[in-house]
């Protein structure tokens, strides 16, 4: 169904939430190579586990402030006082385990950067730098492998479904639904420059 602006979008995009529409149109599925942005999306996807993405997206600005603009070095060094402040912050999701996982995952993220040169090089090596198009799934062999590897490295809240959503968000997977005005555009455009 066409929206008021004449475009067809993925069915999950909420036509009543401008933030969600902008996220769908301007971010989701567009390949990311910036490590800070990759860390931000990893943390947000981990917090989304068991919740709606819209809930997380609506709190994103507060997460940015609370988590020092997703600076992985700062997050990896959080003290118990900082963790307590996060657990008391009504503007973010205050799940104790997810907050602790953000610190644990920041440490593992930094270790991966040391090993691969960047987290971008790590995440994109799984597809040889190419965008993969697939829709209608919540996990895949790719997300299974990455999830298993990240868990082995000590990360938390990185099950295959979370990692699949992460890969979609950062554009490793192009999953815009057939009919969506963005379907396959990212893969065709970005793979032509690889």
Which positions does each model-derived feature cover?
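HhH-family (HhH-GPD) DNA N-glycosylase catalytic core used in base-excision repair
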Residues: 1-194
């Amino acid at each position: 169904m066409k929206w008021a602006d004449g475009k067809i979008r993925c069915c999950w995009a909420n036509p009543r939430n401008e933030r969600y529409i902008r996220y769908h149109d301007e971010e989701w599925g567009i390949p990311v190579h910036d490590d800070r942005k990759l860390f931000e999306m990893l943390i947000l996807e981990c917090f989304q586990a068991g919740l709606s993405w819209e809930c997380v997206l609506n709190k994103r600005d507060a997460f940015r402030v609370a988590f020092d603009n997703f600076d992985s070095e700062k997050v990896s060094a959080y003290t118990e006082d900082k963790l307590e402040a996060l657990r008391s912050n009504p503007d973010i999701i205050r799940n104790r385990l997810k907050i602790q996982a953000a610190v644990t995952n920041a440490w593992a993220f930094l270790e991966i950067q040391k090993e691969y040169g960047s987290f971008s090089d790590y995440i994109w090596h799984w597809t040889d730098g190419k965008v993969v198009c697939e829709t209608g799934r919540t996990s895949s062999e790719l997300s299974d492998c990455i999830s298993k590897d990240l868990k082995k490295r000590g990360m938390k809240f990185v099950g295959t479904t979370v990692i699949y959503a992460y890969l979609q968000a950062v554009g490793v997977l192009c999953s815009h639904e057939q009919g969506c005005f963005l379907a396959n555009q990212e893969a065709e455009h970005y793979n032509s420059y690889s």
